[in-house]
Amino acid sequence: IIHQDPVLSTTKLIAEPWDLGEGGYQVGNFPLLWSEWNGKYRDTIRDFWRGEHYTIGDFAFRFTGSSDLYQDDGRLPHASINFITAHDGFTLNDLVSYNEKHNEANGEGNRDGESYNRSWNCGIEGETKDSEILSLRAKQRRNYLTTLMLSQGVPMMLGGDEIGRSTQGNNNTYCQDNELSWFNWQLSKTQQALLTFTQKLIKFRQDHPIFSRHQWFFGREIHGSGVVDIGWFHPDGSEINDTEWHDSSNQAISIFLNGAEIPNLDNRGQRILDDSFVLLFNPSDEPLDFTIPESVEKTE
């Protein structure tokens, strides 16, 4: 068994936990020491940002490391390899630019590749010069990247997403050893802006350990700050109660992360302290006012 091997057990073991056939989808079923590409994270976050009536309970699980998949068997948040896109499927740019795959160039009659991509073209299929559509697509790319980098677990990016790489709607470019798959490092202003945004986002995550806790959230105070380690709220500032987690009409959410209640210790055995954050998520196409909850207003 791989994870019992004296050499391999000391390495990072990461599974792509699906295969063809019955029983091939094994997300959440690998043993201790293994991390997994979390396909449920990908699907939930894609649906959330394209406005599907997904329950906020599903979003909450994925955003906090998928404890429903990994906690019961003793694994920790880093067991979840979070991703929006990978080598199979749309690039991030194409995820917000195409509703349908366009794999005709592969010579298989567009039958190859995944047909259900949970994508949204923002109003026009494929390339466009419409400034409103382009602006919305840029915002959606930022939404996906920000959610990925602020989620508990290990973020994984598809190379090229940081510069808006496109394969023109082809989501299965295994046979395209040409300009369709190659990287073009001559960046446009839009691509350079996305690269800069992504670099700053990664630096922000690295600077704030609250976004990469080594333990699960408890939903209560740990170190006596008087405030819970995580809180979930409606836009009006009221706390989400147990009966509302599975109400698909509740889409927008604010999340409080308490930087004074991190259970991790640093390399010297000292408590880790960070800033506290209130994160606002609004997947609708309308602006929305949020109220900072009274219970967290006095935290730093």
What feature does the model see in each segment?
Residues H3-G159, G164, N172-Q176, P209-S212, ...:
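Conserved alpha/beta catalytic core and glycan-binding cleft of carbohydrate-active enzymes
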Residues I81-N82, S181, I253-I255, T299:
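A broad, low-specificity signal marking well-ordered, structured residues that form hydrophobic/aromatic
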Residues D130-I133, N184-T190:
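Short histidine-centered catalytic/ligand-binding loop motif
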Residues F183, L201-P209, S284-E300:
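C-terminal accessory region downstream of the catalytic core in glycan-modifying enzymes
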Residues K189-H246:
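Catalytic cores of secreted or luminal carbohydrate-active enzymes
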Residues W232-P293:
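Carbohydrate-binding surface patches
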